[in-house]
Amino acid sequence: MSDWKKIASKSDLPGEGEAREFTVNEKVFCVANIDGTYSAMDNVCVHRGGPLGQGVILDGKVVCPWHGWMYDPKTGAADVSPNARVAVYAIKVEGEDVLIEL
């Protein structure tokens, strides 16, 4: 059974080509805006624990600000290894609310 929780207001979402951190139930998520499409993933890089939501977007990937690992926001896969990945989550906008499926 899916559980949708409010993660942000629409006005708080990152601009195109940006990522931002949001917290729901004491867990921090990375929300990225790539070409107008929003994606949500775990905020912690599997390499050294860097905050992905503080990174940049490059070639459609979220780049960890600590050591440059790049993640596909649709699959959570890291470029360095197909086995290195973060969890991804569905998000949707309803009116002014942005919801994440936990």
Q: Which residues fall in each region the model found?
A:
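Short cysteine clusters
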Residues: C45, C64-H67
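N-terminal pre-ligand scaffold of iron-sulfur
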Residues: M1-D59, D72, A77, R85-L102
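Short glycine/proline-centered loop/turn elements that form peptide/ligand docking sites
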Residues: S81
